[in-house]
A protein has these predicted regions:
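Proline/serine/threonine-rich low-complexity linkers at boundaries of modular beta-sandwich domains
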Residues: 1-6
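Exposed acidic/Ser/Thr-rich ligand/metal-binding surfaces
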Residues: 8-231
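Short aromatic-acidic-glycine turn motif
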Residues: 94, 240-244
């Protein structure tokens, strides 16, 4: 497929004279998707980690449920999804599986009720466990944490799990709910999952005002993850007399 990838190269010198001594030349190569695969992405492998604690009661939880259903509608059967809920305890609502039955997934989400505290660390750990089951170069793996950030367990527990996610190459995307959401806390979790310094804002965290806002954020995340090739190797073949 000749129009699958576009490859352009730029050299810092247009002409290379013949000299007795070695010369240093810089080449910038840029690969971009061609028209045939411009909208193609690798399948997703992600876990939705949902806060259903007492602090999420009312409008927050309603918005969360509708936001999650809007996200589910964007999935294809080749995507892998798991759904984790948490309050005092962590529950695997949907174990990691292909997103073939979107209507069934949405019915599960509709049944989520609020109650209890916000023990977040174990929930992130379970989300990481579920994503790790399918993690491979053939998938784009992520954890999506939806919460108001009102953790009632030790904050260090969530940070530790974010570090573990970063060590496995599985970033956490944060979606915050409610005007009192803990943005700094969620940002640090996201940053740590990228193995970045706290405050660097390397990770993605967004405040979700309504379900449509969540859908927009998710679509932007999808667009940024349109990976069509991984672990690419570039080979230079030189003419006789030249070495790279």
């Amino acid at each position: 497929m000749t129009n699958a990838l576009k490859l352009t190269a730029l050299c810092n010198r247009q002409n290379v004279p013949v000299l007795d001594q070695p010369q240093l030349i810089y080449v910038l190569a840029e690969a971009s998707p061609g028209s045939a695969i411009a909208n193609v992405r690798l399948p997703l492998n992600f876990s939705l980690v949902l806060d259903r604690s007492g602090s999420m009661a009312g409008e927050k939880l309603h918005t969360l449920r509708e936001a999650v259903k809007a996200i589910i509608d964007q999935l294809s059967p080749s995507d892998i999804v798991s759904i984790i809920t948490f309050e005092n305890k962590t529950q695997v609502l949907v174990p990691a599986q292909p997103a073939a039955d979107r209507e069934g997934l949405k019915r599960m989400v509709d049944g989520i009720k609020d109650g209890g505290g916000t023990v977040m660390g174990p929930a992130i750990r379970e989300g990481l466990n579920q994503v790790s089951r399918y993690a491979s170069p053939n998938y784009i793996s992520r954890i999506v944490l939806l919460t108001d950030g009102e953790a009632t367990d030790k904050l260090e527990a969530s940070m530790h799990e974010a570090d573990n996610a970063g060590a496995r190459g599985i970033p956490i995307i944060g979606m915050g709910f409610g005007s009192d959401w803990k943005e700094d806390f969620m940002q640090e979790i996201a940053d740590r999952s990228w193995l970045a310094d706290p405050g660097s804002e390397a990770g993605r965290v967004e405040f979700i005002r309504n379900p449509g806002n969540a859908l927009q954020v998710f679509q932007e995340v999808l667009q940024s993850m349109h990976v069509v090739a991984k672990q690419v190797t570039v080979t230079f073949r030189m003419v006789q007399g030249l070495e790279a």
